[in-house]
From Swiss-Prot:
Positions of Zn(2+) 1 binding: 17, 19, 103, 251
Hydrolase keyword on record: yes
Catalysed reactions, as listed in the record: (S)-dihydroorotate + H2O = N-carbamoyl-L-aspartate + H(+)
SUPFAM superfamilies reported for this sequence: Metallo-dependent hydrolases
Residues modified to N6-carboxylysine: 103
Organism of this sequence: Shigella boydii serotype 4 (strain Sb227)
InterPro entries, per the entry: Amidohydro-rel, DHOdimr, Dihydroorotase_CS, Metal_Hydrolase
Protein name (database record): Dihydroorotase
Amino acid sequence: MTAPSQVLKIRRPDDWHLHLRDGDMLKTVMPYTSEIYGRAIVMPNLAPPVTTVEAAVAYRQRILDAVPAGHNFTPLMTCYLTDSLDPNELERGFNEGVFTAAKLYPANATTNSSHGVTSIDAIMPVLERMEKIGMPLLVHGEVTHADIDIFDREAHFIESVMEPLRQRLTALKVVFEHITTKDAADYVRDGNERLAATITPQHLMFNRNHMLVGGVRPHLYCLPILKRNIHQQALRELVASGFNRVFLGTDSAPHARHRKESSCGCAGCFNAPTALGSYATVFEEMNALQHFEAFCSVNGPQFYGLPVNDTFIELVREEQQVAESIALTDDTLVPFLAGETVRWSVKQ
Protein backbone atom coordinates (compact mmCIF):
# COMPACT_ATOMS: atom_id res chain seq x y z
CA MET A 1 0.00 0.00 0.00
CA THR A 2 1.31 3.44 -0.88
CA ALA A 3 0.00 6.25 1.31
CA PRO A 4 1.04 9.78 0.46
CA SER A 5 -0.98 12.15 2.61
CA GLN A 6 -3.71 12.74 0.03
CA VAL A 7 -4.08 9.40 -1.79
CA LEU A 8 -4.46 5.84 -0.51
CA LYS A 9 -3.94 3.08 -3.05
CA ILE A 10 -5.16 -0.32 -1.89
CA ARG A 11 -5.94 -3.68 -3.40
CA ARG A 12 -9.62 -3.76 -4.40
CA PRO A 13 -11.66 -4.52 -1.27
CA ASP A 14 -14.47 -6.99 -0.69
CA ASP A 15 -17.59 -6.56 1.43
CA TRP A 16 -18.09 -9.60 3.64
CA HIS A 17 -21.62 -8.66 4.78
CA LEU A 18 -24.09 -6.98 2.43
CA HIS A 19 -27.84 -6.66 1.93
CA LEU A 20 -28.82 -5.98 -1.68
CA ARG A 21 -32.58 -6.61 -1.37
CA ASP A 22 -34.42 -7.38 -4.62
CA GLY A 23 -36.43 -5.81 -7.43
CA ASP A 24 -36.18 -2.04 -7.87
CA MET A 25 -34.22 -1.60 -4.64
CA LEU A 26 -31.56 -4.06 -5.87
CA LYS A 27 -31.26 -2.17 -9.15
CA THR A 28 -30.84 1.13 -7.29
CA VAL A 29 -28.26 0.05 -4.72
CA MET A 30 -26.17 -2.43 -6.69
CA PRO A 31 -23.88 0.08 -8.49
CA TYR A 32 -22.76 1.64 -5.20
CA THR A 33 -21.19 -1.67 -4.23
CA SER A 34 -20.09 -3.04 -7.60
CA GLU A 35 -18.11 0.08 -8.56
CA ILE A 36 -15.89 -0.31 -5.48
CA TYR A 37 -15.84 -3.92 -4.30
CA GLY A 38 -14.66 -7.03 -6.13
CA ARG A 39 -16.90 -9.42 -4.22
CA ALA A 40 -19.53 -9.35 -1.53
CA ILE A 41 -21.14 -11.91 0.75
CA VAL A 42 -24.83 -11.39 -0.02
CA MET A 43 -27.29 -11.89 2.81
CA PRO A 44 -30.17 -14.32 2.14
CA ASN A 45 -32.93 -12.65 4.19
CA LEU A 46 -35.31 -11.94 1.34
CA ALA A 47 -39.01 -12.65 1.67
CA PRO A 48 -39.14 -15.60 1.22
CA PRO A 49 -35.55 -16.33 2.31
CA VAL A 50 -32.92 -18.02 0.14
CA THR A 51 -33.00 -21.62 1.38
CA THR A 52 -32.43 -23.65 -1.80
CA VAL A 53 -29.74 -23.91 -4.46
CA GLU A 54 -32.27 -22.91 -7.12
CA ALA A 55 -33.32 -19.79 -5.22
CA ALA A 56 -29.68 -18.78 -4.78
CA VAL A 57 -28.89 -19.31 -8.47
CA ALA A 58 -31.90 -17.21 -9.48
CA TYR A 59 -31.04 -14.44 -7.00
CA ARG A 60 -27.41 -14.41 -8.12
CA GLN A 61 -28.58 -13.90 -11.70
CA ARG A 62 -30.82 -10.98 -10.68
CA ILE A 63 -27.83 -9.42 -8.92
CA LEU A 64 -25.56 -9.89 -11.94
CA ASP A 65 -28.26 -8.39 -14.18
CA ALA A 66 -28.21 -5.27 -11.96
CA VAL A 67 -24.42 -4.80 -12.17
CA PRO A 68 -23.62 -1.96 -14.60
CA ALA A 69 -21.47 -2.65 -17.64
CA GLY A 70 -17.82 -2.09 -16.84
CA HIS A 71 -18.09 -3.17 -13.20
CA ASN A 72 -16.31 -6.42 -12.38
CA PHE A 73 -18.23 -7.82 -9.43
CA THR A 74 -18.83 -11.32 -8.07
CA PRO A 75 -21.70 -11.95 -5.63
CA LEU A 76 -20.95 -14.69 -3.09
CA MET A 77 -24.24 -16.31 -2.16
CA THR A 78 -25.34 -17.58 1.24
CA CYS A 79 -27.98 -20.00 2.44
CA TYR A 80 -30.48 -18.97 5.10
CA LEU A 81 -30.51 -21.64 7.82
CA THR A 82 -33.92 -22.84 9.03
CA ASP A 83 -34.97 -25.56 11.43
CA SER A 84 -36.14 -27.68 8.48
CA LEU A 85 -33.19 -27.21 6.09
CA ASP A 86 -31.89 -30.41 4.49
CA PRO A 87 -28.10 -30.82 5.02
CA ASN A 88 -27.86 -32.46 1.58
CA GLU A 89 -29.25 -29.32 -0.10
CA LEU A 90 -26.68 -27.20 1.70
CA GLU A 91 -23.80 -29.51 0.77
CA ARG A 92 -24.94 -29.64 -2.87
CA GLY A 93 -24.95 -25.85 -3.06
CA PHE A 94 -21.50 -25.63 -1.49
CA ASN A 95 -20.03 -28.32 -3.76
CA GLU A 96 -21.52 -26.68 -6.87
CA GLY A 97 -20.00 -23.32 -5.94
CA VAL A 98 -23.39 -21.70 -5.41
CA PHE A 99 -23.22 -21.25 -1.64
CA THR A 100 -20.07 -19.71 -0.17
CA ALA A 101 -21.39 -19.82 3.40
CA ALA A 102 -24.56 -20.29 5.46
CA LYS A 103 -26.21 -17.67 7.65
CA LEU A 104 -27.59 -18.25 11.13
CA TYR A 105 -30.28 -15.79 12.16
CA PRO A 106 -31.83 -16.45 15.55
CA ALA A 107 -35.59 -16.28 14.87
CA ASN A 108 -36.82 -12.66 14.89
CA ALA A 109 -33.42 -11.11 15.65
CA THR A 110 -33.50 -8.69 12.71
CA THR A 111 -35.16 -7.77 9.39
CA ASN A 112 -36.89 -10.73 7.69
CA SER A 113 -35.63 -13.27 10.24
CA SER A 114 -38.95 -14.79 11.31
CA HIS A 115 -37.95 -18.01 9.50
CA GLY A 116 -34.71 -18.15 11.49
CA VAL A 117 -33.39 -20.82 13.79
CA THR A 118 -35.23 -21.49 17.06
CA SER A 119 -32.35 -23.38 18.70
CA ILE A 120 -28.90 -24.67 17.82
CA ASP A 121 -30.05 -28.22 18.55
CA ALA A 122 -32.69 -27.89 15.82
CA ILE A 123 -29.98 -27.43 13.16
CA MET A 124 -27.19 -29.57 14.63
CA PRO A 125 -27.20 -32.04 11.69
CA VAL A 126 -26.73 -29.09 9.31
CA LEU A 127 -23.92 -27.60 11.40
CA GLU A 128 -22.19 -30.97 11.67
CA ARG A 129 -22.31 -31.27 7.88
CA MET A 130 -20.89 -27.76 7.51
CA GLU A 131 -18.03 -28.61 9.84
CA LYS A 132 -17.31 -31.75 7.81
CA ILE A 133 -17.23 -29.99 4.42
CA GLY A 134 -15.44 -26.83 5.63
CA MET A 135 -18.33 -24.44 4.97
CA PRO A 136 -18.22 -21.20 6.99
CA LEU A 137 -21.07 -20.34 9.35
CA LEU A 138 -22.02 -16.64 9.48
CA VAL A 139 -23.71 -15.68 12.72
CA HIS A 140 -25.98 -12.83 13.74
CA GLY A 141 -24.88 -13.04 17.36
CA GLU A 142 -27.82 -11.93 19.46
CA VAL A 143 -30.21 -13.81 21.70
CA THR A 144 -33.86 -12.86 21.28
CA HIS A 145 -35.41 -13.77 24.64
CA ALA A 146 -37.90 -11.10 25.70
CA ASP A 147 -36.31 -10.77 29.15
CA ILE A 148 -32.84 -9.87 27.81
CA ASP A 149 -32.19 -6.15 27.36
CA ILE A 150 -31.48 -5.21 23.74
CA PHE A 151 -28.09 -3.76 24.70
CA ASP A 152 -27.07 -7.07 26.33
CA ARG A 153 -28.14 -9.50 23.60
CA GLU A 154 -24.71 -9.90 22.02
CA ALA A 155 -22.87 -10.57 25.29
CA HIS A 156 -25.51 -13.14 26.29
CA PHE A 157 -25.22 -14.81 22.89
CA ILE A 158 -21.49 -15.42 23.35
CA GLU A 159 -22.04 -17.13 26.67
CA SER A 160 -25.20 -19.09 25.93
CA VAL A 161 -24.89 -19.95 22.21
CA MET A 162 -21.56 -19.15 20.56
CA GLU A 163 -19.16 -20.69 23.07
CA PRO A 164 -21.15 -23.93 23.57
CA LEU A 165 -21.48 -24.26 19.77
CA ARG A 166 -17.76 -23.80 19.19
CA GLN A 167 -16.91 -26.22 21.99
CA ARG A 168 -19.17 -28.81 20.39
CA LEU A 169 -18.02 -28.32 16.78
CA THR A 170 -14.37 -27.43 17.21
CA ALA A 171 -13.47 -27.49 13.50
CA LEU A 172 -16.39 -25.30 12.33
CA LYS A 173 -15.33 -21.99 10.74
CA VAL A 174 -17.39 -19.16 12.23
CA VAL A 175 -17.72 -15.49 11.31
CA PHE A 176 -19.17 -13.47 14.18
CA GLU A 177 -20.83 -10.80 12.08
CA HIS A 178 -21.14 -7.09 12.79
CA ILE A 179 -19.70 -7.29 16.29
CA THR A 180 -20.67 -4.35 18.50
CA THR A 181 -19.29 -4.98 22.00
CA LYS A 182 -16.03 -5.20 23.90
CA ASP A 183 -17.20 -8.68 24.90
CA ALA A 184 -17.27 -9.78 21.26
CA ALA A 185 -14.01 -8.00 20.37
CA ASP A 186 -12.24 -9.77 23.24
CA TYR A 187 -13.87 -13.09 22.40
CA VAL A 188 -12.76 -13.02 18.77
CA ARG A 189 -9.29 -11.74 19.60
CA ASP A 190 -8.79 -14.53 22.13
CA GLY A 191 -10.28 -17.21 19.86
CA ASN A 192 -8.52 -19.61 17.51
CA GLU A 193 -7.94 -19.38 13.76
CA ARG A 194 -11.44 -20.75 13.02
CA LEU A 195 -13.16 -17.65 14.45
CA ALA A 196 -13.30 -14.27 12.69
CA ALA A 197 -15.47 -11.14 12.78
CA THR A 198 -16.76 -8.32 10.62
CA ILE A 199 -17.33 -4.76 11.83
CA THR A 200 -19.49 -2.05 10.24
CA PRO A 201 -18.48 1.58 9.72
CA GLN A 202 -21.32 2.83 11.93
CA HIS A 203 -20.18 0.78 14.92
CA LEU A 204 -16.64 2.14 14.54
CA MET A 205 -17.74 5.76 14.09
CA PHE A 206 -20.65 6.06 16.50
CA ASN A 207 -22.11 4.93 19.81
CA ARG A 208 -25.62 5.04 21.20
CA ASN A 209 -25.29 8.67 22.32
CA HIS A 210 -24.95 9.72 18.68
CA MET A 211 -28.25 7.99 17.92
CA LEU A 212 -30.24 9.13 20.96
CA VAL A 213 -28.93 12.41 22.42
CA GLY A 214 -30.62 15.58 21.18
CA GLY A 215 -33.19 13.67 19.13
CA VAL A 216 -33.60 10.21 17.69
CA ARG A 217 -31.59 9.66 14.51
CA PRO A 218 -33.39 6.83 12.72
CA HIS A 219 -30.74 6.49 10.02
CA LEU A 220 -28.25 5.34 12.69
CA TYR A 221 -30.67 2.69 13.93
CA CYS A 222 -29.45 -0.77 12.99
CA LEU A 223 -29.24 -4.22 14.57
CA PRO A 224 -27.24 -5.07 16.55
CA ILE A 225 -27.95 -1.64 18.03
CA LEU A 226 -25.18 0.90 18.68
CA LYS A 227 -23.69 0.39 22.14
CA ARG A 228 -21.88 2.47 24.80
CA ASN A 229 -18.71 4.38 24.01
CA ILE A 230 -16.57 1.77 25.85
CA HIS A 231 -17.68 -0.82 23.28
CA GLN A 232 -17.08 1.51 20.33
CA GLN A 233 -13.55 2.14 21.58
CA ALA A 234 -12.86 -1.60 21.92
CA LEU A 235 -13.89 -2.14 18.29
CA ARG A 236 -11.68 0.73 17.13
CA GLU A 237 -8.73 -0.64 19.07
CA LEU A 238 -9.25 -4.11 17.60
CA VAL A 239 -9.10 -2.91 13.99
CA ALA A 240 -6.26 -0.48 14.73
CA SER A 241 -4.16 -3.29 16.20
CA GLY A 242 -3.84 -4.97 12.81
CA PHE A 243 -5.55 -8.11 14.12
CA ASN A 244 -5.92 -10.35 11.06
CA ARG A 245 -9.21 -12.12 11.79
CA VAL A 246 -11.37 -9.02 11.59
CA PHE A 247 -12.43 -7.63 8.24
CA LEU A 248 -14.70 -5.30 6.33
CA GLY A 249 -18.42 -6.08 6.42
CA THR A 250 -20.58 -3.02 5.86
CA ASP A 251 -23.93 -4.64 6.67
CA SER A 252 -25.27 -2.04 4.24
CA ALA A 253 -29.03 -2.47 4.60
CA PRO A 254 -31.22 -0.17 2.52
CA HIS A 255 -34.77 0.76 3.49
CA ALA A 256 -36.94 3.41 1.81
CA ARG A 257 -37.09 6.67 3.76
CA HIS A 258 -40.71 6.20 4.87
CA ARG A 259 -39.78 2.86 6.45
CA LYS A 260 -36.92 4.46 8.42
CA GLU A 261 -38.61 7.74 9.40
CA SER A 262 -41.62 6.09 10.99
CA SER A 263 -43.34 5.48 14.32
CA CYS A 264 -41.94 1.94 14.06
CA GLY A 265 -38.85 2.34 11.91
CA CYS A 266 -36.82 -0.40 10.27
CA ALA A 267 -33.29 -1.32 11.34
CA GLY A 268 -30.43 -0.85 8.92
CA CYS A 269 -27.96 1.73 7.58
CA PHE A 270 -27.51 2.12 3.83
CA ASN A 271 -23.78 2.79 3.93
CA ALA A 272 -22.55 1.33 0.62
CA PRO A 273 -21.80 4.77 -0.91
CA THR A 274 -19.76 6.02 2.07
CA ALA A 275 -18.49 2.95 3.94
CA LEU A 276 -14.96 2.69 2.52
CA GLY A 277 -14.17 6.34 3.19
CA SER A 278 -15.66 5.98 6.67
CA TYR A 279 -13.36 3.07 7.45
CA ALA A 280 -10.37 5.07 6.14
CA THR A 281 -11.29 7.95 8.43
CA VAL A 282 -11.38 5.64 11.46
CA PHE A 283 -8.02 4.05 10.62
CA GLU A 284 -6.51 7.51 10.11
CA GLU A 285 -7.90 8.73 13.44
CA MET A 286 -6.37 5.67 15.12
CA ASN A 287 -2.97 6.21 13.40
CA ALA A 288 -3.41 2.78 11.83
CA LEU A 289 -3.57 3.39 8.09
CA GLN A 290 -0.83 0.79 7.67
CA HIS A 291 -3.47 -1.85 8.57
CA PHE A 292 -6.27 -0.42 6.41
CA GLU A 293 -5.60 -2.47 3.28
CA ALA A 294 -5.43 -5.76 5.18
CA PHE A 295 -8.76 -5.04 6.89
CA CYS A 296 -10.45 -4.16 3.59
CA SER A 297 -8.81 -6.48 1.10
CA VAL A 298 -6.70 -9.27 2.62
CA ASN A 299 -8.03 -10.61 5.93
CA GLY A 300 -11.40 -11.66 4.50
CA PRO A 301 -10.10 -13.67 1.54
CA GLN A 302 -7.50 -15.23 3.82
CA PHE A 303 -10.14 -16.49 6.25
CA TYR A 304 -12.41 -17.75 3.46
CA GLY A 305 -9.53 -19.39 1.59
CA LEU A 306 -10.03 -17.23 -1.51
CA PRO A 307 -7.48 -15.30 -3.58
CA VAL A 308 -7.13 -11.58 -3.02
CA ASN A 309 -8.30 -9.28 -5.80
CA ASP A 310 -5.66 -8.40 -8.39
CA THR A 311 -6.87 -4.88 -9.18
CA PHE A 312 -6.43 -1.72 -7.12
CA ILE A 313 -8.46 1.34 -6.19
CA GLU A 314 -7.54 4.75 -4.82
CA LEU A 315 -9.11 6.81 -2.07
CA VAL A 316 -8.53 10.53 -2.08
CA ARG A 317 -8.42 12.72 1.01
CA GLU A 318 -10.48 15.74 0.10
CA GLU A 319 -13.66 17.00 1.65
CA GLN A 320 -16.83 15.98 -0.14
CA GLN A 321 -20.46 16.33 0.78
CA VAL A 322 -22.62 13.21 0.89
CA ALA A 323 -25.91 13.37 -1.02
CA GLU A 324 -29.00 14.02 1.11
CA SER A 325 -30.91 11.25 -0.63
CA ILE A 326 -30.97 8.83 -3.55
CA ALA A 327 -34.05 8.44 -5.73
CA LEU A 328 -36.15 5.28 -5.67
CA THR A 329 -39.12 4.59 -7.94
CA ASP A 330 -41.67 5.87 -5.41
CA ASP A 331 -39.59 7.14 -2.48
CA THR A 332 -36.01 8.04 -1.57
CA LEU A 333 -33.12 6.31 0.14
CA VAL A 334 -31.08 8.17 2.76
CA PRO A 335 -27.41 7.15 2.71
CA PHE A 336 -25.22 6.85 5.80
CA LEU A 337 -23.79 10.33 6.65
CA ALA A 338 -26.34 12.03 4.35
CA GLY A 339 -25.63 15.74 3.96
CA GLU A 340 -22.40 15.52 5.95
CA THR A 341 -18.90 16.40 4.82
CA VAL A 342 -16.60 13.38 4.65
CA ARG A 343 -12.82 13.32 4.59
CA TRP A 344 -12.06 10.29 2.38
CA SER A 345 -13.82 9.08 -0.74
CA VAL A 346 -13.13 6.65 -3.56
CA LYS A 347 -11.37 8.28 -6.50
CA GLN A 348 -13.60 8.11 -9.55
